[in-house]
């Protein structure tokens, strides 16, 4: 729960911001990390010393539910001559270390990141006649902050967030987010490390899909060229009713060319998925490592979890902590990170140590496998094949309903335990599937209807008997079984 008050209002939950000429004695009573970020805000908004602020009534470090202590809201006049409209500018306080006493973040020194190393910002177009900023963006930022604290995954510029609901709970088409550097806020050196500022940018579903298929930075650049869709400062307009591709159809050609040239930076997603070993009789479950719908999933060993974390760090941090909390209780939202690929794609860890399977969990070669996805996850298979495998990369689905993962690898990926001789291999509940370029092209032809969800009827099955591979697209309810 939060309350709205001027940031300079007295009280234990919202300490007053110091003036530009505050004496050192007063500044010393102010949390140093908070003081440093306020200094950057004062540089940008010298005429707004006490902006409205949404404040967590019970602080996170006192057991409250909201990780952000404060969200300040400023009025930005923009620049009409540069196609930058007047807007509200929201700035968070709490993802970085505000206090330096380990109450929230462990102090690790002044040279590295402060806390998680960043704060969130958001720019919302001001509506005509609007005298005060809406407060819903503060709750949106709290939701993203909860994800960061729960998962310990950080955000980077170019990342995207699949939210699956209008950001303001209206009927808006703006239902997802990209992240980018704030165009005005400069990195701040605090006594507890460096803080950068990442801006949330609201986007339509079609724009999110393009970011997944290509990369977030490319779509952000396109949004900057369309004033109504964001313009130079990427200001979110919740009343925008058209995608950038409807506004300028030529932009789709730039995306298609980018995918063909660059491939996709997205290397993994949290998903509703499962796999079965069809080469093993159903009753023969001794030493079985596959996760079957309707059966109790086996859990990853600690070593397996660490291996998957390390080897897929470039694009997917796999863990057993909650995924992004839903803005709408009826929906479960997922987060997908969009990272730039390294020079050589590999399933090795950062230390260049190849995967060495734990001796107690042997790697098994499988003769035949059955992959199962919900419709949203299945719709990403063409992206996996065209944007990743055809560019010599890998792509991972990490289950959000069990401790298992499915990694597709191309023949050029190093460190994989699936090989051309044994293309299906499992290490515990982690399945790897190696696909040749020829087979990828064949699958893309056969899976073409996955790109037209409006014409899709579930369940849907695809089969390649000569490859002993089957893929099923199933209703969400199949994956929501309490036993799965």
Swiss-Prot record:
Query: Where are the residues of the annotated region Disordered?
Result: 1-24, 279-360
Role description: Negative regulator in the hedgehog/smoothened signaling pathway. Down-regulates GLI1-mediated transactivation of target genes. Down-regulates GLI2-mediated transactivation of target genes. Part of a corepressor complex that acts on DNA-bound GLI1. May also act by linking GLI1 to BTRC and thereby targeting GLI1 to degradation by the proteasome. Sequesters GLI1, GLI2 and GLI3 in the cytoplasm, this effect is overcome by binding of STK36 to both SUFU and a GLI protein. Negative regulator of beta-catenin signaling.
List keywords of the entry alphabetically: Acetylation, Ciliopathy, Cytoplasm, Developmental protein, Disease variant, Isopeptide bond, Joubert syndrome, Nucleus, Phosphoprotein, Tumor suppressor, Ubl conjugation
Please give the InterPro entries that the UniProt record associates with this protein. Answer: SUFU-like_domain, SUFU_C, SUFU_C_sf, SUFU_N, Suppressor_of_fused, Suppressor_of_fused_euk
Per UniProt, subcellular location reads as: Cytoplasm; Nucleus
Which positions carry Phosphoserine?
301, 342, 346, 352, 481
Tissue localization of expression is:
Ubiquitous in adult tissues. Detected in osteoblasts of the perichondrium in the developing limb of 12-week old embryos. Isoform 1 is detected in fetal brain, lung, kidney and testis. Isoform 2 is detected in fetal testis, and at much lower levels in fetal brain, lung and kidney.
**Disease linkage:** Medulloblastoma: Malignant, invasive embryonal tumor of the cerebellum with a preferential manifestation in children. Joubert syndrome 32: A form of Joubert syndrome, a disorder presenting with cerebellar ataxia, oculomotor apraxia, hypotonia, neonatal breathing abnormalities and psychomotor delay. Neuroradiologically, it is characterized by cerebellar vermian hypoplasia/aplasia, thickened and reoriented superior cerebellar peduncles, and an abnormally large interpeduncular fossa, giving the appearance of a molar tooth on transaxial slices (molar tooth sign). Additional variable features include retinal dystrophy, renal disease, liver fibrosis, and polydactyly. JBTS32 inheritance is autosomal recessive.
Q: Where is the composition biased (Basic and acidic residues)?
A: 336-347
Compositionally biased spans, kind Pro residues: 12-23
Put simply, this protein is called: Suppressor of fused homolog
Q: What Pfam families does this protein map onto? A: SUFU, SUFU_C
Q: How this protein is processed and modified after translation, per its record?
A: Polyubiquitinated at Lys-257 by the SCF(FBXL17) complex, leading to its subsequent degradation and allowing the release of GLI1 for proper hedgehog/smoothened signal transduction. Ubiquitination is impaired by phosphorylation at Ser-342, Ser-346, Ser-352 and Thr-353.
| Phosphothreonine PTM sites in chain numbering | 353
Q: Crosslink site(s) for Glycyl lysine isopeptide (Lys-Gly) (interchain with G-Cter in ubiquitin)?
A: 257
To which species is this protein native?
A: Homo sapiens (Human)
What changing residue 128 to A/D does, per the record, is: No effect on down-regulation of GLI1 activity
Q: Give the protein family.
A: Belongs to the SUFU family.
Lineage at the top is: Eukaryota, Metazoa, Chordata, Craniata, Vertebrata
**Any single biological process term in GO:** signal transduction
